[in-house]
Amino acid sequence: MTAMLTLETMASEEEYGPRNCVVCGDRATGYHFHALTCEGCKGFFRRTVSKTIGPICPFAGRCEVSKAQRRHCPACRLQKCLNVGMRKDMILSAEALALRRARQAQRRAEKASLQLNQQQKELVQILLGAHTRHVGPMFDQFVQFKPPAYLFMHHRPFQPRGPVLPLLTHFADINTFMVQQIIKFTKDLPLFRSLTMEDQISLLKGAAVEILHISLNTTFCLQTENFFCGPLCYKMEDAVHAGFQYEFLESILHFHKNLKGLHLQEPEYVLMAATALFSPDRPGVTQREEIDQLQEEMALILNNHIMEQQSRLQSRFLYAKLMGLLADLRSINNAYSYELQRLEELSAMTPLLGEICS
């Protein structure tokens, strides 16, 4: 719809000359949220109007809003956006936005060849190689981090749970280990290393927990709803015993059941993780355009791989479902930070995880 309106704007410019943003007077690019605006005011309105606490004008709402002055007073700029008819209800939720992007990428992919080109195949192999070296084998190594005896499969379900401290210590150790392996995985990717160190850190802090759960899903059993890591068996009850809130764990279980039910192949898991990694909207990111292009490339390869490998019936909505699950992971990621702050003992044991979730 936006593209169509932008084309209409271009056509009207040829007939009537350039049209200006009704908020600041800059050149308008189309109708955004029900008003003819520039890209700057469109982005400002999306970022600002949904905040719980809005900006306050120190000059009683009398500031001029123009192209030159629009950044000086966010409160007056926001009020003018509302006065000219921009509507909050037209802003898509994170999930709806992810699904729209998924549909857009799917349409682009359908126009392009569904066969991966040589460069894309090589990129998939690089991702798989890094995943095989650092992430795939890490679950079998959990046993080296002093697990309580009742976590061993041959003890379950008979062995009663022991005191919580050994379990918390084990959880802290394996979470730190997983984050370390995910860092090694990303550092093994030339595209990731090509970014500035500041952006590498910002992307890792934003995506580490999401990549962790995408990878952990490979150990999840849909029938028992347990995670099997080498000789160890983890149940959601173990996390409850350690102090995690039941509602938080329910959202994690829901995610893993939905993802496991899609029966992904290893390349699809890895490409999903790469799509999460290269997210240009993480806090602190500076090279947004470059990272956005990287994410679009990963998403396009993921969609083409699905269309190439899966049956037509199975693949029809798979890509859109994966994009929706990535949106769910954002919510889990945010909730994980709060849980870590609440569990002070676990937080104290995992400084690396605390830094990632800060």
Swiss-Prot record:
The modification Phosphothreonine is found at residue 48. Pfam families: Hormone_recep, zf-C4. Predominantly expressed in liver. Changing residue 336 to A: Diminished binding of coactivator NCOA2 in the presence of TCPOBOP. Changing residue 244 to A: Diminished binding of coactivator NCOA2 in the presence of TCPOBOP. GO terms for molecular function: DNA binding; DNA-binding transcription activator activity, RNA polymerase II-specific; nuclear receptor activity; RNA polymerase II transcription regulatory region sequence-specific DNA binding; zinc ion binding. The record marks 171, 175, 216, 227, 244, 336 as: Important for TCPOBOP recognition. Residues 18-93 bind DNA. GO terms for cellular component: cytoplasm; cytoskeleton; cytosol; nucleoplasm; nucleus. It comes from the Eukaryota. One of its GO terms (biological process) is negative regulation of DNA-templated transcription. Its main location: nucleus. Changing residue 175 to F: Diminished binding of coactivator NCOA2 in the presence of TCPOBOP. A zinc finger (NR C4-type) spans 21-41, 57-81. Phosphorylated at Thr-48 by PKC, dephosphorylation of Thr-48 is required for nuclear translocation and activation. The keyword Translocase does not apply. Residues 119-358 form the NR LBD domain. InterPro entries: NHR-like_dom_sf, Nucl_hrmn_rcpt_lig-bd, Nuclear_hormone_rcpt_NR1, Nuclear_hrmn_rcpt, ThyrH_rcpt, Znf_hrmn_rcpt, Znf_NHR/GATA. SUPFAM superfamilies: Glucocorticoid receptor-like (DNA-binding domain) (SSF57716), Nuclear receptor ligand-binding domain (SSF48508). The keyword Mitochondrion does not apply. Composed by a short N-terminal domain followed by the DNA binding, hinge, and ligand binding/dimerization domains. Heterodimer of NR1I3 and RXR. Interacts with PSMC4. Interacts with ECT2. Directly interacts with DNAJC7; this complex may also include HSP90. Interacts with CRY1. Interacts with CRY2 in a ligand-dependent manner. PANTHER family: NUCLEAR HORMONE RECEPTOR (PTHR24082), NUCLEAR RECEPTOR SUBFAMILY 1 GROUP I MEMBER 3 (PTHR24082:SF231). Binds and transactivates the retinoic acid response elements that control expression of the retinoic acid receptor beta 2 and alcohol dehydrogenase 3 genes. Transactivates both the phenobarbital responsive element module of the human CYP2B6 gene and the CYP3A4 xenobiotic response element. Belongs to the nuclear hormone receptor family. NR1 subfamily. This is Nuclear receptor subfamily 1 group I member 3. The lineage of its organism: Eukaryota, Metazoa, Chordata, Craniata, Vertebrata.
